[in-house]
Amino acid sequence: MLSNLHAVMDKAEAYAEERKFSPDNYVAMRLAPDMLPFSFQIQSSTDRAKLFLSRVSGVAAPTWADTEKTWAEVKARLETGLDFARSVPAAQLDGTEDKLIPLKVRGEEVQWPAQKYLLENALPNFFFHVTTAYDILRHAGVPVGKRDFTG
């Protein structure tokens, strides 16, 4: 999904270029006044992916400052997230379905099996932020559709 989001960002960049405006305009866009901007959606998407992969595989997660303010910085953040995801060996995830993962869920300390963490926390949060990023760009007029989202 992060690679699909990257492709959507490529289309957004091309759309901005065709229309002669800076893709930096997308960075602060939001769907509603009380929602967080596009930059936050990319930060959260990459955070959800890295935290799941790190917690389950044991591979140390990179730290990111969440200071991206330009299109280039936001895109670089997504690329860094993709690089980390690709670097985690699949073998370190195999057989971890029952591994207990300590989490804080709604302010409560819990230990969930990795499969429950994936299905009830990591994926829903990840898809929420990826979808919101897509929706912000779509709302801005970027000509993308379901196939762009799903790949």
What residue ranges belong to the model's regions?
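Helix-adjacent hinge/juxtasegments
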Residues: K50-V88
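Short, contiguous alpha-helical
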Residues: A28-A61, E109-V144
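Short, highly charged C-terminal tails/helix-capping segments
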Residues: V144-G151
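Hydrophobic alpha-helical packing residues
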Residues: L5, M9-A12, A49-F52, G81, ...
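N-terminal structural module
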Residues: M1-D47
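Acidic interhelical loop/turn segments
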Residues: E17-V27, S87-L118, T150
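Generic structural signal for well-ordered, non-transmembrane alpha-helical segments
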Residues: S3-H6, Q43, A72-E79, D83, ...
